[in-house]
Swiss-Prot record:
The gene is nfo. The keyword Hydrolase applies. This is Probable endonuclease 4. GO terms for molecular function: deoxyribonuclease IV (phage-T4-induced) activity; DNA binding; DNA-(apurinic or apyrimidinic site) endonuclease activity; phosphoric diester hydrolase activity; zinc ion binding. The keyword Zinc applies. Zn(2+) 2 binds at residues 147, 181, 215, 260. It is an enzyme of class 3 (hydrolase). It comes from the Bacteria. Endonuclease IV plays a role in DNA repair. It cleaves phosphodiester bonds at apurinic or apyrimidinic (AP) sites, generating a 3'-hydroxyl group and a 5'-terminal sugar phosphate. It catalyses: Endonucleolytic cleavage to 5'-phosphooligonucleotide end-products. Its EC number is 3.1.21.2. Its cofactor is Zn(2+).
Amino acid sequence: MPKLLGSFISFKSPHYLVGSVRDAVSIKAQAFMIFLGAPHTALRVDPNRMQIDEGHTLMEQHNLSKSGMVVHAPYIINCASKDPVKQTFAIDVLTREVKLCHAVGAKLIVLHPGSAVEQTQTQALDHLIKVLNTVIANTKEVIICLETMAGKGNEIGRDLDQLKYVINHIEQQERIGVCLDTCHFHDSGNDFNNTAEIMETIDTKLGFEFLKVIHLNESKNVCGSKKDRHANLGEGMIGFDNLMRFIAQPQIKQIPIVLETPSDKHNYPAVYGAEIERIRAWFGAR
């Protein structure tokens, strides 16, 4: 059984962290992932308004560990941009976001690696490395987790070789890791029908010591499609049993596993509660 299983959780006014913890508790989650503001903007409220201490107290009351709390960086930044102005913006936003993570008690922040606009993939990776080393040098403790991407358009991070290249050039490697998104990994060409092959790929190309978070998602598309369209568990092309066999692996079930499957205002957070219950039922039957 996964130790830290949960989902994306809303973080919003007026209750912020307290509201997030309440939602996580309501679906019996052991982990949760939040945006510290709207995903497509850099605007953030003062941390004094985020009800952090009250949220931590509520977490303790419900045995929710801070090791299961994950933050997602805003989508608005492209840390791989060659534009000096956009690089500076990315550094400023990500630095502030990492400091906010530290303030709310999260040790992990997930980041989309960026896009290779008007440059080669390698050039984009080098720009990402520069941004990450700068941000890490100006912050503390929080681990930046580069998310595996599906490979659509000019995205970088479409394979583990690229992410390991970045890791190899980070000056403080204890501050860098990877978030493996199962939908993205499938869409970029990794077949979850073969669990052993998936695990070998992670082991040889990355190393499990750098795998810090799992985004557990189904995919609406075939393997290798490079589409990035999430589906709910049991409704996609990866296969529920394949996903369960993957997260049952000893190297996987000890890290935060977070659902990012589709939800809306009518079924949030209940849809995640139902999926968590289904996952636990699968493990309970074995």
